């Protein structure tokens, strides 16, 4: 099973998650003020995910590794969860690279 995006609304804001084939969330977006902007964010993830240079490998204050996926303009378009090891973070990046391009979107904004 391949990955998929879930587009959600929360009040007047929109966001999306990228799920791996096992249904685990591997990337969470920023919040958007319009559905169209969130859909553009999904398209940007699909476009930028294969490019390793678009990933910032970061460490939280508590030492937990995580990553941020950035667009060509340098703006963050999604972040990972906090991982226990850098290897787990790198596996998360590999999962985004393989699951995001061409992933369908499940629109839950009408639910």
Swiss-Prot record:
Q: Check the record and name the InterPro entries matching this protein.
A: DUF1508 (IPR010879), UPF0339_domain (IPR051141), YegP-like_sf (IPR036913)
The keyword Oxidoreductase belongs to this UniProt entry's keyword annotation: no
Signal peptide positions are none
SUPFAM superfamilies in UniProt: YegP-like
Task: Spell out the residue ranges that the record assigns to sequence repeats.
Answer: 9-57, 60-108
- Please list where the region (Disordered) is annotated: 86-111
Q: Which Pfam families match?
A: DUF1508
Sorted UniProt keywords: Repeat
The entry sums up its family as follows: Belongs to the UPF0339 family. Duplicated subfamily.
Q: What is this protein called?
A: UPF0339 protein BP0521
Organism annotation: Bordetella pertussis (strain Tohama I / ATCC BAA-589 / NCTC 13251)
């Amino acid at each position: 099973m391949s990955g998929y995006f879930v587009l959600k609304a929360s009040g007047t804001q929109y966001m999306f998650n990228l799920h791996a084939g096992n249904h685990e969330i591997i990337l969470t977006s920023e919040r958007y003020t319009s559905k169209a902007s969130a859909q553009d964010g999904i398209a940007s993830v699909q476009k930028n995910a294969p490019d390793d240079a678009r990933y910032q490998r970061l460490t939280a204050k508590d030492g937990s590794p995580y990553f941020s996926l950035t667009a060509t303009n340098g703006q963050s378009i999604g972040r990972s969860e906090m991982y226990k090891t850098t290897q787990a973070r790198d596996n998360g990046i590999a999962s985004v690279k393989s699951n995001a391009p061409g992933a369908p979107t499940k629109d839950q904004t009408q639910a």
